[in-house]
């Protein structure tokens, strides 16, 4: 039995049906009219769905999913408002999700710590320092290191002030992103902090400099790993391909194909999930 703790509270899915359809159209390079022709669903109904006015029948959702090469079971579950989420268990360390209001959903930062220690590894820093401090767990007295997944404001807005208040803390970011005082990490970089190891996965797509991070406890090799996925993989969805849709799709499928199914996924937005759950239900897995 592992000495672990996960502080879990409700977090809404990052994307509704309209968001998933819009992203899938962008990823596939399809216009609304072409999708209407391929799916035999009226263009106006597709536009209404993207604008969160849903009047699609189950059969139309199935045809849209097939035309977009989406996982129809997951797409239908999102349309019904009942996307399945797994029980989160098996981590060999403590995980603290920090949920920041962002639009109608949340942006996430995380702190990972050996449960016997008062120092933690911070992944992203949220939109600003004051919100970060309000959410900061009382058991964590000081950050041991900071890892940034990518440079959108809601993920690193609190970084500069956190460094100013805490002093000399190592900061790590993706290659290609210049952050003052930060060390850029490429594919396969490994860093050890006590019992914990952090490994870098280079995952451009949502933006060009983007990393995911795998956290493990090498002394517990059968325990579940943690994937901090930034804006690559969400519960029930994927990031928007602002930079490159082919690279985003390739990295999304790489994560789902290569990581153990027990891997807990800590995304940049929305609730925790697992690789097993997303292999089964994520609409972007076909």
Predicted ranges, named:
Residues 1-28:
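A short, Lys/Arg-rich alpha-helix, primarily the initiator
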Residues 7, 11, 118, 207-286:
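Metallo-beta-lactamase
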Residues 31-38, 64:
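Short alpha-helical "recognition helix" segments of helix-turn-helix
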Residues 41-56:
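Recognition helix of helix-turn-helix/homeodomain-like DNA-binding domains
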Residues 55, 127-199:
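Active-site HxH/HxHxD metal-binding segment of metal-dependent hydrolases
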Residues 59-74:
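DNA major-groove recognition helix of helix-turn-helix/homeodomain DNA-binding modules
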Residues 87-138, 213-229, 235-236:
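Conserved beta-strand hairpin/beta-sheet module of binuclear metal-dependent hydrolase folds
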Residues 111, 190-222:
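Core dinuclear metal-dependent hydrolase active-site scaffold
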């Amino acid at each position: 039995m592992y000495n672990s703790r996960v502080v879990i509270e409700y977090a809404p899915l990052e994307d509704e049906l309209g968001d998933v359809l819009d992203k899938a159209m962008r990823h596939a390079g399809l216009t609304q009219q072409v999708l209407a022709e391929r799916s035999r669903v009226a263009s106006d109904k597709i536009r209404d769905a993207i604008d969160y006015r849903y009047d699609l029948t189950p059969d139309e959702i199935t045809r849209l999913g097939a035309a977009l090469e989406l996982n129809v079971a997951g797409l239908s579950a999102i349309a019904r408002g009942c996307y399945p989420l797994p029980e989160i268990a098996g981590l060999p360390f403590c995980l603290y999700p920090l949920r920041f209001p962002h639009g109608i959903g949340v942006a996430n930062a995380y702190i990972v710590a050996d449960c016997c220690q008062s120092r933690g590894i911070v992944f992203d820093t949220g939109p600003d320092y004051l919100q970060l401090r309000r959410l900061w767990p009382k058991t964590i007295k000081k950050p041991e290191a900071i890892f940034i997944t990518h440079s959108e404001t809601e993920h690193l807005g609190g970084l500069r002030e956190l460094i100013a208040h805490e002093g000399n803390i190592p900061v790590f970011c993706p290659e290609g992103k210049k952050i003052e005082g930060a060390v850029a990490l490429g594919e396969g970089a490994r860093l050890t902090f006590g019992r914990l190891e952090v490994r870098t996965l280079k995952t451009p797509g949502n933006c060009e400099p983007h990393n995911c991070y795998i956290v493990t406890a090498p002394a517990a090799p059968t325990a579940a790993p943690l994937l901090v996925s930034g804006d690559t993989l969400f519960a029930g969805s994927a990031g928007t391909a602002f930079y490159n849709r082919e690279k985003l799709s390739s990295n999304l499928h790489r994560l789902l194909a290569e990581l153990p199914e027990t891997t807990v996924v800590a995304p940049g937005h929305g609730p925790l999930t697992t690789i097993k759950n997303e292999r089964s239900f994520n609409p972007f897995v076909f």
